[in-house]
Design a protein with these regions (language model features):
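Positively charged, solvent-exposed patches that mediate nucleic-acid binding
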Residues: 1-116
Length: 116
């Protein structure tokens, strides 16, 4: 589970990331990022009905949370991030999702230099 201080909780915070954030796309997901001026990075996860029914959407969000939790020690501070699942994510394995998130974090320059 992602620690509470690393979660975007308010709808208004997620809306700000959607409106003002910069985006990077991958066939499995979309990453939107906005600077938050804080000493931590926070995350939210979205899976719309295009991904599938409720069970499939919840699995997609669980996969994304687990992958971000794994990358969290290597992610720079001061960012609000929104990960939006795309339809292909429902059939993807944990390794594929991990690779996709890693690629997007690298392209967004969010991974610190000493990360693996």
């Amino acid at each position: 589970m992602l620690p509470p201080q690393h979660r975007l909780k308010r709808t208004s915070e997620v809306a700000l990331v959607r409106q003002q954030g910069r985006s990077w796309r991958h066939p499995l997901l979309i990453l939107l990022v906005r600077a938050n001026g804080q000493e931590i990075s926070r995350f939210a996860f979205v899976a719309s009905r295009f991904v599938g029914k409720a069970v499939v959407r919840n699995r997609a969000k669980r996969l994304l949370r687990e992958v971000v939790r794994h990358h969290l020690p290597h992610i720079g501070t001061g960012w609000d991030c929104l990960l939006i699942a795309r339809a292909g994510l429902s059939q993807a394995s944990l390794e594929e999702v991990n690779a996709a998130v890693g690629q997007l974090l690298t392209r967004a320059h969010l991974l610190q230099e000493n990360s693996d």
